[in-house]
Design a protein with these regions (language model features):
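Non-catalytic, conformational "gating/processing" segments within enzyme and secreted inhibitor domains
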Residues: 103-139
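Short amphipathic beta-strand starts and helix->beta connectors
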Residues: 1, 98-109, 162-163
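His/Glu-based metal-binding/catalytic segments typifying zinc-dependent metallopeptidases
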Residues: 118, 146-204
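Acidic/histidine-enriched alpha-helical segments
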Residues: 38-62, 150-158
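M16 family metallopeptidases and their MPP-like homologs
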Residues: 1-38, 57, 61, 70-96, ...
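A common structural junction motif
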Residues: 30-42, 138-147
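Short, conserved charged micro-motifs
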Residues: 17-25, 129-134, 187-190
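A generic local secondary-structure boundary/capping motif
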Residues: 65-66, 108-112, 165-169
Length: 204
């Protein structure tokens, strides 16, 4: 939807498979909490060398999107259909916005993010619920939670009076056609099934 989601994921083997039955949940949760709550910084900003490396990775990912013509066509469709709306912003952003990123400004934004964003925790494994709760609560105990904002609800934009057609010529062997419909239907499940039937998934 209109909201940006940021995720942190840790994978670990079950204690029963660890040598000597070592308990792994707690140290892994602690590491995850440290990465989220206390990332490495330098003079109130992300470390420039690490920042520059990740910035280049982001730019490379944005530029390589055109190599997957289906994903590129989907991205162009949303940018044109939802121009001026948050939903029209590409998932990775644009080259222009990525180029403007700076370590100090990004760190300030990150601090705002972890202070105001809603937090959801998911665990899949065999550890008892109480143990998982204790491990995660301890790991995230320093996470500021007193300024959490409610998620804003957005109404879909109304359908255009006239069909918008956009063409882009590329050196490809197979063209891609994307069609977007602003329907605003409350019957979301049926709409998604219809999208799948018309070729909206790998199972179509």
């Amino acid at each position: 939807g209109e909201n940006q989601c940021v995720g942190f994921v840790a994978s670990l083997i079950d204690d029963s498979f660890a040598p000597g039955g070592e308990r792994l949940l707690e140290p892994v949760a602690e590491l995850l909490g440290e990465l989220i709550c206390a990332p490495i910084t330098e003079r109130g900003r992300f470390v420039p060398a690490y920042f520059d490396s990740e910035k280049q990775n982001l730019l490379d990912a944005i530029r390589s999107l055109i190599n997957d013509k289906r994903d590129y066509a989907d991205s162009r469709l949303l940018r044109e259909m939802c121009a001026g709306e948050a939903y029209g912003v590409p998932r990775l952003g644009t080259e222009e916005t990525a180029e403007r990123l700076q370590p100090k400004r990004l760190y300030a934004w990150y601090q705002e993010l972890i202070s105001t964003a809603r937090l959801e925790l998911f665990y899949s494994g065999s550890a008892p619920q109480r143990r998982v709760e204790q491990a995660l609560l301890a790991a995230l105990s320093s996470l500021p939670r007193d300024q959490v904002r409610e998620i804003a609800l957005h109404q879909p934009h109304p359908a255009r009076a006239e069909v918008l057609r956009v063409e882009e010529a590329l050196d490809v062997t197979q063209g891609k056609l994307g069609m977007g419909f602003a329907c605003g239907s409350d019957d979301y499940a049926a709409m998604m099934l219809g999208n799948t039937l018309f070729g909206g998934s790998s199972n179509s």
